[in-house]
Amino acid sequence: MTKNAISKSISSVEDFLEQTGKVWAGYEHKPFPNSIAAKELSSFIRPESIGTAYSQAATLIEVAADYAFALKSTLTEPAQSIAPWTCVRGCLEAASLSMWLFDTKIDAKERVRRSLAFRYEGLDQQAKLAETTKGIVNPKDIHKRINQIEQLAQELGYPRVLNKKNKRIGVGQEMPSVTKIVKKMLNKEQNYRLLSGMVHAHPWALQHFGFIQTHSEQIIFENVKGAYFEKHITLDSINFLCVETIQCMFEALKMNFDLFGWDIKPIALATKSAVDQIQFE
């Protein structure tokens, strides 16, 4: 692989983030009049709940961008062969969740339902963390907050979310798995599973995308032969990771722009320019 081609791929992500970040920040998260978002904020029974959903989704775009910046760092010399896949998986996950909350195909009631489910999922995980701290963090305080959110959900007309044993499993709705959300919003289940294989260090994934065989039939232990591998990442893999990052970031931004009534053209042009920089073999 040539250093020039790698440099252009890395620069494509950096340029994309710089250009789109300026445009996105310029709108100051304020929806235009007559946009879907403006109508939801003025018509929903509790505008604060709509605002919470928008804030959650916008934060997730920030998270996705942070992972994208980290990708650049992991691919800059001395380049890593495993960490970049973790960055892109995090970017894909955050972008998909943002799209799920910014979804332009749902109404305000469904948006708040999803927002409540996302809040419950996070607090439920926080409560489990608290239970491991041996009293440093009181899980009862977190469960109290969950109860308050569930009460709010019921006041807004959402029924309790219980399993067959009458145990609470969500608020608003049961939270779908990230894999299902990635498939629903980006149709990238295959790529997400590949990235997950690398993140979880499965041998089949590492041997294909994180290492290269250098020697075979070598004595590794007494009476044991095997192969030696070295960490390695190909130009094809780098290009895949960069394109995946740019594409999922674009789709999340597009959903936000469409919902808030902003002009998507500068973002689309920045995306095309970034992808065009990448030299495919």
Label the model's feature ranges.
Residues 85-86, 93, 104-110, 223-234:
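Intrinsic-disorder/low-complexity, polar/charged segments
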Residues 79, 106-107, 210:
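Residue-level detector of alpha-helical recognition elements and their boundaries
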Residues 1-53, 118-281:
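Secondary-shell segments that build the walls of catalytic and ion/ligand-binding clefts
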Residues 84-86, 102-114, 258-267:
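Short, glycine/acidic-rich hinge or "gate" loops at secondary-structure transitions
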Residues 39-103:
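Long, hydrophobic/aromatic-enriched structural stretches that serve as scaffold segments
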Residues 86-93, 108, 113-116, 212-217:
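Amphipathic alpha-helical scaffolding segments
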